[in-house]
Amino acid sequence: MLVVVGAGGVGKSALTIQLIQNHFVDEYDPTIEGIRPKQVVIDGETCLLDILDTAGQEEYSAMRDQYMRTGEGFLCVFAINNTKSFEDIHHYR
């Protein structure tokens, strides 16, 4: 499972939807969490990759912590116009 983490409002869901559906969402709609499957080809073999779009808001940190222990890969997302979202990335390890 690929876990997408970062502060609230930085674009985690927009990036996930772009990857899955080739459609960019430009409206902010807070996510609680969602798992989206993506079929990929790795070394010539077709695989199903589960992508977990996590909530960035602090009130959902307990749910996020569970997936941080079981995730196999992590995509850390921050907003280039929000220095704090970059500085806070280390909280997600």
Swiss-Prot record:
Summary of activators and inhibitors of this protein: Alternates between an inactive form bound to GDP and an active form bound to GTP. Activated by a guanine nucleotide-exchange factor (GEF) and inactivated by a GTPase-activating protein (GAP).
Keyword set, alphabetical order: Cell membrane, GTP-binding, Hydrolase, Lipoprotein, Membrane, Nucleotide-binding, Prenylation
Gene3D superfamilies (alphabetical): P-loop containing nucleotide triphosphate hydrolases
Species the sequence originates in: Limanda limanda (Common dab)
Statement: the UniProt record of this protein carries the keyword Cell membrane: yes
Catalytic activity: GTP + H2O = GDP + phosphate + H(+)
Enzyme class label: hydrolase
Residue interval(s) of motif Effector region: 28-36
Subcellular location: Cell membrane
GO molecular function, a single term: GTP binding
GO biological process, one term: signal transduction
Similarity-based family: Belongs to the small GTPase superfamily. Ras family.
Membrane topology: Lipid-anchor
PROSITE patterns given in the database record: RAS
Record-linked SMART domains: RAB, RAS
GO cellular component: plasma membrane
InterPro entries per record: P-loop_NTPase, Small_GTP-bd, Small_GTPase, Small_GTPase_Ras-type
Function: Ras proteins bind GDP/GTP and possess intrinsic GTPase activity.
EC number: 3.6.5.2
Binding site for GTP: G6, A7, G8, G9, V10, G11, K12, S13, D53, T54, A55, G56, Q57
Source domain of life: Eukaryota
Protein name: Ras-like protein
